[in-house]
Amino acid sequence: NNSGDNIRLSREEFQKRHEAYLTKFAELTADEAAKFFPIYNELEKRKQELNDQIFGAMRESREKDLDEAKYKELLEGMSANAIAIESLERTYLDRFKEVISYKKIFKIKEAESRFRQELVRGMRRPGGEGRAGGPPVPDAPSNDRRR
């Protein structure tokens, strides 16, 4: 665990730790990881681009009071964004299946959830660890399933 780390990680270091976490949790071989992560990272980039559009609109709504029509437009955009992301995930599921098993894809999804939970837990830690430099990034899990 990174309980002693209170440094801001570069995007590359964060991605490296995230990939190590997912690889270990899903028990990917080196060959599987080498084939899987370029596809996975492409999906994540496309999802981020969609989310950036919505977050920009949400930021704008906090900076100035919008009328009802603008809030309606914002909510419709959020809904359309969720649908677009779901569609991307379905498309990429087919691509993931070409390089790893459904079982390992499922484990990746589970690992993503656990990784996020551990990030949030790190942000809530007494003393505000990570507050100045962001949350500590979880290390790859052990194969101890009692977590």
Each model region followed by its residue ranges:
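Short N-terminal segments immediately surrounding and downstream of signal-peptide cleavage
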Residues: N1-R17, N143-R145
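Amphipathic, charged alpha-helical segments and their helix-to-coil junctions
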Residues: E86-R147
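Amphipathic alpha-helical segments
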Residues: I7-R8, H18-V99
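Proteins with a high burden of low-complexity, intrinsically disordered sequence enriched in S/T/G/P/A and R
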Residues: N1-G4, A26, I105
